[in-house]
Amino acid sequence: MITLTPGHLTLPQLRRIAREPVQLKLDPASFAKIDAGAKAVADIAAKGEPAYGINTGFGRLASTHIPHDQLELLQKNLVLSHAVGVGEPMARSSVRLLMALKLSSLGRGHSGIRREVMDALITLFNADVLPLIPVKGSVGASGDLAPLAHMSAVLLGVGEVFIRGERASALDGLRVAGLAPLTLQAKEGLALLNGTQASTALALDNMFAIEDLYRTALVAGALSVDAAAGSVKPFDARIHELRGHQGQIDAAASYRELLEGSPINQSHRDCDKVQDPYSLRCQPQVMGACLDQMRHAADVLLVEANAVSDNPLIFPDTGEVLSGGNFHAEPVAFAADNLALAAAEIGALAERRIALLIDATLSGLPPFLVKDGGVNSGFMIAHVTAAALASENKTLAHPASVDSLPTSANQEDHVSMATFAARKLADIADNTKHILAIELLAAAQGVDLRAPYHTSPKLAPVMETIRGKVAHYELDHYFAPDIAVIAKLVGERAFAKVAPFSFASEQ
């Protein structure tokens, strides 16, 4: 059970919400603020004075006054008309994050929503009744309207859900959770729809996956150093302290620890090779830069996870209703775009190491890591697959945040595209996962070929894990299943756990 304290969510809590079957409860300390916000809205609605989102239309129709007897219909119509998403359903882990983030935002008491509505969301979450939310349809301002409308429609008994993973109607989902359809009151539909929770949830969910891939890449890169008989001197702490970037310093320390005590490395200490190619030698510099970007993105996304991104905002102490632009997800878009750059570079560097290993001139290993080259092609086309995926990532890493299209008759004339920026991270991460799987296989093959010498004590379990699933590549065979099984292990964090490093979300 995780207690949600609005405005005080942590990255470890968010990772658990995405990855573990935890349940939620709202911190009772938030109840007074929530109730005060709801009362403030009720008082404004009763007076009948125009206030955006409470008794007016929306977007370009903000100047249209809505009579008191139509306020409930206004909120219902808002939810139903905005539920226009398309595409595949959002991943379960992202939906769980989305719901938790929405609860945190509402729970700060500046949205004017009743606790009854929040309790219904928590009940659905804890019953494992998750809204079916199409993943496409948001431009990231005014908030993530379409995705959040699909979440909200379920509270009205409209739309679809997943009941413990099985697709069903919203009414069936409410029944399983022991709920009845709600009637939303003034401002509540808008409070549910307005916000950056979809883009932030997608960005966080994919960030956690990319963090795991980063740690796996440290392990794969270190194993490739041994496979290529590379030097550990470029990882000397003194080099990296002189430059000063913390990510680089931390990455170099990881490589030193992973490769410490390697018999392969000790076997060629006195060789006449002066410098390794950049894909081996400059790993701390490249991976360190990725790490710095990822840490910054995590900081931004944590702030956004705890933010109130509704509009308008209710200030119960003064009774004011202030319209602003906290729904604009530009910070999320930038963070997601930076994560895309980092994830693509992790894959690009791994692809270069694969290319090095299969090149006999550079690695000193048999061509394409197989005996009887010619009749056997070995890792030749596995590298082509890695190259294809790395190239695809370069296109996917193009920043989404530089694009904008005006909407709502030019009332909403600049948007963030944060949801697309966050959503495409999943494709980049999947490509990088498979590149790393190919590198792990190639590096393990190279280490085998260095016999009788072995890799380091830290990397020995990695070899055991790989060889426990995939045998040494003796002769050409149907290769795709080998890649698939190692990619599955990468996704399960089997190799990430070996890295002597952890992110803030894992602590």
UniProtKB/Swiss-Prot annotation:
It is an enzyme of class 4 (lyase). The keyword Lyase applies. GO terms for molecular function: histidine ammonia-lyase activity. One of its GO terms (biological process) is L-histidine catabolic process to glutamate and formate. The modification 2,3-didehydroalanine (Ser) is found at residue 142. GO terms for cellular component: cytoplasm. Its EC number is 4.3.1.3. Pfam families: Lyase_aromatic. Contains an active site 4-methylidene-imidazol-5-one (MIO), which is formed autocatalytically by cyclization and dehydration of residues Ala-Ser-Gly. Keywords: Cytoplasm, Histidine metabolism, Lyase. It is found in: Cytoplasm. There is a cross-link at residues 141-143 (5-imidazolinone (Ala-Gly)). It comes from the Bacteria. Pathway: Amino-acid degradation; L-histidine degradation into L-glutamate; N-formimidoyl-L-glutamate from L-histidine: step 1/3. It catalyses: L-histidine = trans-urocanate + NH4(+). PANTHER family: HISTIDINE AMMONIA-LYASE (PTHR10362). Belongs to the PAL/histidase family. This is Histidine ammonia-lyase. It comes from Burkholderia orbicola (strain MC0-3).
